[in-house]
Amino acid sequence: MKLRFGVTAAEKKAWIVFLVLLGLTAAVLIISAGLGQRFIPPWDVAKTFFGAGSKLDELMIMSFRMPRILTALCAGVCLAAAGAILQGLVRNPLASPDIIGITGGAAVAVVLLMMFFSDRSSSLTISLSWLPAAAFIGASAVGLIVYLLAYKNGASTFRLVLIGIGFSMSAQAMTTLLMIKGPIYRASQANVYITGSVYGSNWQHVKIAIILSVILLFICFVALKNMNIQVLGEDIAAGAGSAVQRNRFFLLLLSTALTGCAVSVAGTIGFVGLMAPHIARRLVGSSYGALLPASALIGALLVLTADIVGRTLFAPVEVPAGVFTAAIGAPYFIYLLYKTRNS
């Protein structure tokens, strides 16, 4: 059904959902910026953003709280976008970066970097800019190996998922082994990291996360047509003139890059890439023009909310955001397994 000015009812609904999600994200961001040992009311947070707040509020928000908030936002966006791409790529609702091993590969690479290039104060002895590089290399290596092992007259989506799950388990074992064999002061740092936490984020983390996120999301929107074609299946995509295997490999690489970006700044926050695309698909449908931005905003909301809960529920003790996303995501994964048991 077309409305006036050529806008379909589905497009109008997608725009409404997008604006609501954008408003919710802004609201959660403001609430998060006000929470901590010193509570700052939302209106004072808003005044601070516009340069009219007190010096103390500005110090608390801009120096200590905003870096972790923006890091959480970027991590959620990247993980959700990666999950949306993977689910369309393999046409399997259970696909996500953490389930098929991509997140695990990134985590192993980053933990290795931490083990070899950190001092007794758990501070890195190299630039933070090496973390995204290590995460991307680890994620890409696992993604490439999974793709090659699944390739037989074309990469089978079913084999991709099965082999990916095996690599995910192997990556977890490798990370645990590194923590056991490494010095205790490095193991404790790595443990917080692999649980998924934005604690200790600074503006250098934010700079890296924002630059990489913007570049990768721009590439995602350029590749929207390829994403929509891949969802149709190999035969239809090939009939439409798409280079199926080349596009599949490119989208897998894009997903690994998004995952590497998120893991490098926030650790392995699980199940965001699984849940966000499912929720978005129910709200806006399966067209990637609407699905991708909706998934990204839902992913940001999930990680921001998990970080708020982790900071406040057991205060003054902070619980990593990944603990709460896993607490929600694991039952959701079981629900999806049950729902798709006959598929």
From Swiss-Prot:
Q: List the disulfide bonds.
A: none
| Induction cue | Induced by iron starvation, repressed by fur.
Gene3D superfamilies, per database record:
ABC transporter involved in vitamin B12 uptake, BtuC (1.10.3470.10)
**Which SUPFAM superfamilies did the record assign?**
ABC transporter involved in vitamin B12 uptake, BtuC (SSF81345)
Q: Which Pfam families match?
A: FecCD
Source domain of life: Bacteria
What is any one GO biological process for this UniProt entry?
siderophore-dependent iron import into cell
What is the documented disruption phenotype for this protein? Strains lacking this gene show a reduction in growth stimulation by the iron-hydroxamate siderophores schizokinen and arthrobactin compared to wild-type.
Annotated membrane-spanning segments are 15-35, 69-89, 97-117, 130-150, 160-180, 204-224, 249-269, 289-309, 317-337
Q: How does it sit in the membrane?
A: Multi-pass membrane protein
Gene Ontology CC terms: plasma membrane
Q: Name its cellular compartments.
A: Cell membrane
Q: Which is one GO molecular function term here?
A: transmembrane transporter activity
Report the main location listed first in the record: membrane
Q: Which keywords belong to this entry?
A: Cell membrane, Ion transport, Iron, Iron transport, Membrane, Transmembrane, Transmembrane helix, Transport
Q: What InterPro entries does its record include?
A: ABC_BtuC-like, ABC_transptr_permease_BtuC
Its function, per the record, reads: Part of the ABC transporter complex YfiYZ/YfhA/YusV involved in import of the iron-hydroxamate siderophores schizokinen, arthrobactin and corprogen.
The family this protein is said to belong to: Belongs to the binding-protein-dependent transport system permease family. FecCD subfamily.
Q: Which PANTHER family match?
A: FERRIC ENTEROBACTIN TRANSPORT SYSTEM PERMEASE PROTEIN (PTHR30472), FERRIC ENTEROBACTIN TRANSPORT SYSTEM PERMEASE PROTEIN FEPG (PTHR30472:SF24)
Subunit architecture:
The complex is composed of one ATP-binding protein (YusV), two transmembrane proteins (YfiZ and YfhA) and a solute-binding protein (YfiY).
Q: What is this protein called?
A: Probable siderophore transport system permease protein YfhA
